Amino acid sequence: MDEFHXYGKEDSSWQQCFLYPLFFQEDLYAIYHDHYLDGSSSSESMEHLSSNDQFSFLTVKRLIGQIRQQNNSIVFFLNCDPNPLVDRNKSFYYESVLEGLTLVLEVPFSIRSKYSVEGMNEWKSFRSIHSIFPFLEDKFPHSNYILDTRIPYSIHPEILVRTFRRWIRDAPSLHPLRSVLYKYRNSPDNLQRSIIIAPRVNTRFLLFLWNHYVYGCESILVPLLKQSFHPRSSSHGSFPDRTHFDRKIKHIIRNSRRNSLKSIWSLKDPRIHYVRYAERSIIAIKGTHLLVKKCRYHLPIFRQFYFHLWSEPYRVCSHQLSKNCSSSLGYFLRVRMKPLLVRTKMLDELFITDLITDEFDPIVPIVPIIGLLAREKLCDISGRPISKLYWTSLTDDDILDRFDRIWKNIFHYYSGSLDRDGLYRIKYILSLSCAKTLACKHKSTIRVVRKELGPELFKKYFSKEREFDFPAFSSKAAARSQRERIWHSDIPQINPLANSWQKIQDLK
């Protein structure tokens, strides 16, 4: 693999034209075989090992050779023996073929994405979730409209094959991909007759298809939007001081109406920012309402003509940040006006000036979170705490750890909101539900539980000091958190509660 990467750097045409021989390299399937044995620790994998002690690479090669045959039911095992052990072995070889196909196709894709990231003027994709919230905090106050779009996930298999043909010239390597996609499309379980890819799937093959599909869409869409919204203008470069710039230009070229209109249009300086997480993408726009309507109209047309995807108009929603909120990433996103008092001293006089600035203010959806906690049997619909009867068989430390873990995850994810009164309401619900669970386990009351365990035990698990991971500066961090938002860097993904609430919002 390392040698192949080296050859790809020296000659980019070689890595695009000679992919098919890599399907017959045993090392690729050995990588997946070792990964499968090391990564799976379930009882199902142990049963599989007992029924299949030896892994034959020759069998994998024969399966690869049969992929290009017309009757490939032997490979994809749609008409296979009903014996469960045989089915498990065949499905294991089928997964091995898919993993080998994925490993081969990932090599040129990884090289291309690496070069695009290293480029100075290239658009950088595939950032982590840690950079999304600071990006929104930095760019949203300078925008007045947002477009909330959903990327279609039901795709015809031939569209995926054509996207690979744009940068892979090796036609034989695309035949196995086409066979796999069409076989999955025509399977009896697939009623929609299309490939359904999503960012939350478990298989590596579908994850790779999703990443490649999104990369192909964004690599064309984002530079095109930036080029349209950032035209080159000579008016801005020749004036380093832009104070009252609009007024100066109007005064200088008042006689020439045509030039004045051009200059005023360039001074509006429309901007666009793009961010995506999973299948939801947000386009923040600084411009007029007419410009937003044009973008909302042209986005489905762009996807239809470039990628042959029919995107329904209702999938693109526009919101004005100063009036409406947009639900995304488990937050209600909005921009509010923040007044500031600025003291200016000139000679012996002191002036106080009121300034109004826009501030990114995400809102915590308290009512939906309470509804999701009620679904988990931690409270009722009105937010009244109840005992978790399913956890009464655990030890006291395990019960406290589970409730504390739920609170810590919720607080860390929603710590970016300055209005935390609702969060402390969630904390009260969880702490009281924990006390009721312990009281139900010991067959006593909440007062007796608090008296026996002591208030220090609840302070240890539900204290404000544990909300911050700054042992040397815990007091300073707690004081600073009351007036500043802190985005915690230990968030690996979107919160499960926020994810569930977002799915409910999408259904609405």
UniProtKB/Swiss-Prot annotation:
Coiled coil: none
GO molecular function, one term: RNA binding
Localization in the cell: Plastid, Chloroplast
GO CC annotation, single: chloroplast
Keywords assigned by UniProt, alphabetized: Chloroplast, mRNA processing, Plastid, RNA-binding, tRNA processing
GO process terms (BP): mRNA processing; tRNA processing
Domain of life per record: Eukaryota
Main location: plastid
Stated family: Belongs to the intron maturase 2 family. MatK subfamily.
HAMAP family: MatK
Function, in words: Usually encoded in the trnK tRNA gene intron. Probably assists in splicing its own and other chloroplast group II introns.
Name this protein carries in UniProt: Maturase K
Taxonomic source organism: Abies bracteata
UniProt lineage: Eukaryota, Viridiplantae, Streptophyta, Embryophyta, Tracheophyta
